[in-house]
């Protein structure tokens, strides 16, 4: 997996995909988001000068032409001139608490709580890269569930998480994090 930070920097050069984040905050208020372009995923076309209205419930209530539509002074305006909006991206296979650069026996050097901290950093990196929803498909110590709770409670920023908790796998197989043979438990040599 490419570093989320590097991926985020590349994506932010040409697009802004925080629309879903703003639309989904708990303290949603009436607001309008304007930009130079918006990708319409249903038609596959670029829409020029969109004005996206977000209601009290955090949902998009209307999309209009920013050059002709007007809104009241009670509506918060988020001006993203020069940017292109796209819907939040979804990644259906992530391991937020498993940094790609730490594998094998090297993982045994770290405490259990370390992996939860990496999940926080990787969740933020995924969000910065434009991913607003992820499915975490296995996490030691249920770090994905803890991160989801912290995000939902507003303690940290990150994408919506569909957690799995512990991964399922065969002893000695893909999900066996000890990397040790089952015979070791029996004292065999």
Spell out what each predicted region is.
Residues 2-17:
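Bacterial N-terminal signal peptides that target proteins for export
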Residues 46, 70-72, 127-128, 154-157:
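Extracellular/periplasmic catalytic domains that process cell-envelope and extracellular macromolecules
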Residues 78, 135-136, 163:
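General beta-strand structural signal in soluble alpha/beta enzymes
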Residues 155-189:
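Metal-coordinating catalytic core of metallo-dependent amide/deamination hydrolases
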Residues 83-155, 171-176:
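Metal-associated gating/positioning segment near the N- to mid-region
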Residues 23-25:
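N-terminal signal peptide c-region/cleavage motif recognized by signal peptidases
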Residues 38, 43-86:
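Histidine-rich, glycine-flanked metal-binding segment
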């Amino acid at each position: 997996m490419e570093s989320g930070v590097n991926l985020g920097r590349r994506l932010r050069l040409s697009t802004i995909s925080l629309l879903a984040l703003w639309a989904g905050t708990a303290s949603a208020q009436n607001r309008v988001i304007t930009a130079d372009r918006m990708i319409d995923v249903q038609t596959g076309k670029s829409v020029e000068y969109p004005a996206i209205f977000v209601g009290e419930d955090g949902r998009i209530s209307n999309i209009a032409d920013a050059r002709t539509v007007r809104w009241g002074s009670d509506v918060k305006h988020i001006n993203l001139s020069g940017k292109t909006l796209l819907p939040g991206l979804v990644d259906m296979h992530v391991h937020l608490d498993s940094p790609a650069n730490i594998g094998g026996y090297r993982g045994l050097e770290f405490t259990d709580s370390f992996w939860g901290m990496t999940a926080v950093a990787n969740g933020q990196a995924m969000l910065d890269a434009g991913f607003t929803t992820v499915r975490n498909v296995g996490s030691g110590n249920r770090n994905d569930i803890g991160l989801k709770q912290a995000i939902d409670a507003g303690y940290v920023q990150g994408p919506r998480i569909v957690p799995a908790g512990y991964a399922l796998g065969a002893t000695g197989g893909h999900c066996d994090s000890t990397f040790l043979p089952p015979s070791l438990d029996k004292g065999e040599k």
